[in-house]
Amino acid sequence: MLETHDVSRCFSTPGGQFWALKDVSISAPEGKLTILKGRSGSGKTTLMNIMGALDKPTSGKVLLAGEDIVQLDERKRALIRRRSIGYVFQSVALIPMMSAYENVEYALRLAGMKSGRRERACECLRMVGLGQRMDHMPQEMSGGEQQRVAIARAIAHKPKVIFADEPTAELDTGTGLQVVKIFKDLCAGEGITIVMTTHDTGLMEIGDMVYELQDGEIIGK
């Protein structure tokens, strides 16, 4: 279970203080897909960054398996990011000179996996339906296929939680639905907790939990 309790985030701007989040409390159940919905500037990406240990709140708690990760020092937070969390961003950012397989295998090396990297990389690419495309370079793949490689890369080190920030924003509706179906399959088959941001109302009914943000506050669930 991943939870936030009364999370607020304030940024200093030339015009004064800007509260991007205001006392946000949500829960993302284990092995389920939780969607954060909202327009640009609603606070959903700020919330995701805090939940994913990429940023700290001004106040509030973030509990991962019962532990408040806000209180951990940066070394421990970095260890959690490396071992327990996977990230999928709107910009896929695959390494262009590496094949699909090499991109995933490289992520395993960075995660410190000593053996079994080839088997795990191939397994993850098969999970996302790219078993026959492992040797293809990113420029030889469609946008949807590249995003699937990014998902394979994110799950390779067997994280507890995956954070996906607008992963379907640059995809057509059909391809976007395929990506979300992969997320649902990973929740059901691998028990991974997935938190995803989107502004696409067509994806709302697919989430197990949906929270709507506006001006840094939860306005709907």
Describe the function of each predicted region.
Residues L2-L213:
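ABC family nucleotide-binding domain
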